[in-house]
Amino acid sequence: MRRSSVMSVVAVVAATGLLLGGCTSDKKNANSGPAATVEIKPTGDYNPLERDQIKDGGELTLPILEVPEQSNSLHGNAIVDGTTLWRWYNPQMTLADGDGTWHPNPAYLTNVNAEEVDGKTVVTYDINPDAVFNDGTPIDWRVFETMWKFNNAENPDVVANSTDGYDQIESVTTGESDKQAVVTYKQAYPWWQALFDRVLHPSVADAQTFNEGYLKNPHPEWGAGPYKVDQFDYNSGTVSFVPNEKWWGEKPKLDKVTYRQMESQATINAYQAGEVDAVEITNKDHLAVAKTVKDTTLRGTLRPSNYLVTLNAKTPTLEDVKVREAVFTGINRETLAQVRFNGMDYTENLPGSFALFQNQKGYQDNFGGLVTYDQDKAKQLLDEAGWTEGSDGIREKDGKKLTLRYVTFGDSQLTKSTAAAMQKMLKDIGVDLQVAERPSSDFSKVIAEREFDVLTSGFTSYDPYGVAYFKQVYASDSELNKSGTGTPEMDKKIAELQQLPTQEEQIKRANELEKEALQQYGIMPYVNGPQLYATKNGLANYGSYAFALVPKENIGWAK
């Protein structure tokens, strides 16, 4: 399970054992009485209920910020919203508890066995005999082979989201039958549970199909699971799913699931009007509105994500590492955090790593030791880079002003306040930060085409195996990190990191390498934060998930 990009209008991730002030903790009615806090539960808060406690029938309507044109969740331009939609109609091979504990999904995998043979990790997957794609193609060992071939970095024409782990596989073969896949790694590989949460239909047979086959085409016939595509309108931003008559597992509880694309501010208005059944609370204004809505449950959790500032080193102005260091040195991360959490009675330590989160074993603050807010130092760095202060205070070099384009998405007040804070801080060191406002639906396009100098966005993790994705974050060909600051030297060191046989050894080395990689000054973490959802009372197995992956057929309304 890899990481995906998410636009920065969403505040996510809370540290263990926190309480968030200013919102109700009542689980029946948001108007039933004034309560001071809602608990931030580190292992998820999504009303887990057994199937016999959930009604048969009903509909679920949810907001989404973008229905991206790229529907392949494994593609390098995939974003969180695309992955959210993908999971409703494609094989969900594995499940997880909120703390990240991994389980095979019995609807697809009847048994999984991992062992070490001659120094190599060998994982055997027994596939459910009934598992089949919507077009009748069996889900067998070939889907594992297809997944491996398109994510192992061997074909330079394939634009994969991440090759971490898959590039460590030596072979994928059939076992005792076509319904058994045997995955053999090149050496001992400690993160094997991070792989094959998803699989690809064997019809994805070449790079062009992988890269372009899902553009404005969800390929419902290549899907499988309890739900199938009912409507997928990329223009209107409406996507819906209904029960799949070809599903072999437990009957899905809902009659229909609908996503509607809307801007961040519109999501809370739609929830207040009863037009959607759940909404993410991203700022104090959303929180205030959610508290007024009857029959609402507020849910808070730890959802591992890093929000970050990215500098595009591929642009002429930012290709100089001294300029990038100056920009980061001139940004007060504490100020950005205060803007993010304004009115939410919440504080946290500044994040310092993209490899691990602050509550994970082995975490180190690898960024904080490199960069501290210091305007005088930032100005000195710009002096050294040849940018001198002009009469208006803006730096100049060779007759050109030091102007950077900061692209934002959506219309939320949080986005505007963050932009204003960034402009003020950078103006103080002589940088003219021009804000370019774009609709939320442009996020994936801007990311894919690097149409920015400065960007705030997020890296969202789906599992606790962060070091397993070190290459995805820091390699020179990363499709996640759009700063363009990777180097061949770091690529070589990452390859050596991935050869280490234990998680402990990889974590230790990853911390050392991250300190080096961050000295390219391409990405800067500035907050994690709480994830809050407002949901209608009775919504089961949905909300703030942390690391949880629940069976889609079990989402529904409590009896």
Predicted regions and their residues:
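Detector for C-terminal structural segments
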Residues: 43-44, 331-363, 414-423, 447-559
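Surface-exposed binding/hinge segments that line
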Residues: 53-55, 124, 160-209
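N-terminal lobe/hinge region of extracytoplasmic solute-binding protein
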Residues: 58-116, 222-223
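Gly/Pro-rich hinge or "lid" segments in bacterial periplasmic/extracellular proteins
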Residues: 87, 98-99, 197-252, 256, ...
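Ligand-site clamp/hinge motif
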Residues: 243-289, 432-434, 439-440
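Ligand/substrate-recognition segments at binding pockets and active sites
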Residues: 234, 388-461
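Append "and occasionally in soluble cytosolic enzymes with long acidic Gly/Pro-rich linkers
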Residues: 242, 321-424, 559
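Aromatic- and charge-enriched surface segment that lines or borders ligand/interaction sites
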Residues: 110-157, 182, 317-319
